[in-house]
Amino acid sequence: ESWNGNSLNHLYVLDKDLKIIGKVEDLAKGETIYSARFMGDRAYIVTFKKIDPLFVIDVSNPREPAVLGYLKISGYSDYLQLYDENHVIGIGKETRGGDENFAWYQGVKIALFDVSDVENPVEVRKIEIGDRGTDSEALSDHKAVLFDKARNLLVIPISLAEKNNQTQSWNNDPDSAYGTLVWQGAYVLNINLDEISLKGKITHNEKYTGPVYIAAKDEPIGATRTDSSGNVWTKFNIMHYDYSSYGYGQWKTSASGYENTIFDDYNIDNFPGGINYVRNQVSNYQTQIKRSLYMDNVLYTISNTKIKANSLSDLSELNKVELPAEQQRYYGGVFAE
């Protein structure tokens, strides 16, 4: 709960009738809970404002939960993944700078905590990916995380931002400066009690080398464009708004399955070579990896546009499947009756 910016954090234990039977109140006053995880007789809670306290809480007696210990470090964890009974993985952001009331978040941080001494948990390993502006689906969707202890494997999506000499900062504070988005895909990490290291990277955002087109709205009637599945679309009409000379193009295809489908200029600009397609070569929601899994010795990564198979041994590409265009309609095509 929060009153006038002074937040209070509580843990409550409920019985089967949803009645409160135990509680720990007023944890980390002025901070906010970012993540929580339960394992056996312990609960782990991360709060954050300026630094990141990791609380270890004993819930073996549901009526008398108690804080066993806590660790204060820079950064925060949006997601906690249990490694084993004495170790926890935190996935979140590193932080630096700021003042006594806040810190600037930086790149994605992955840390391994040793909680075997519950009164004195320790951060034993960590890795920071990218600069301020780097992000990951794993911070808001736990299903985006692939972890396998036996294989020392951790895979998370990453949108990588990096700073350069032209990067602008706030009030000349370098910690406040955002990096430029330079890459998008999945980081494949080695993780064990001795290390967290990069094994390799996989992207679905392949570099485009085909033709580049003008804006679809500037194309004449009769112009054609080809979508990612090879279907040819033709501009057949320009619709004008009432009381305005501005109009938008209408495009159709003779491809099977699109008999009643009409796309406008914006849809066409997202086809290969279109102005939005080229502009979004680095940052593209459609090609952003959202899930990963493995079978035998093959790692599969999944985005809206494709499924890619890579060897778990050396991450070499084995195969890929392009998803049909009808699976990619996120741009509001107009459907006629």
Regions found by a protein language model. Give the residues of each.
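Feature marking well-ordered beta-strand scaffolds used for ligand recognition
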Residues: 1-337
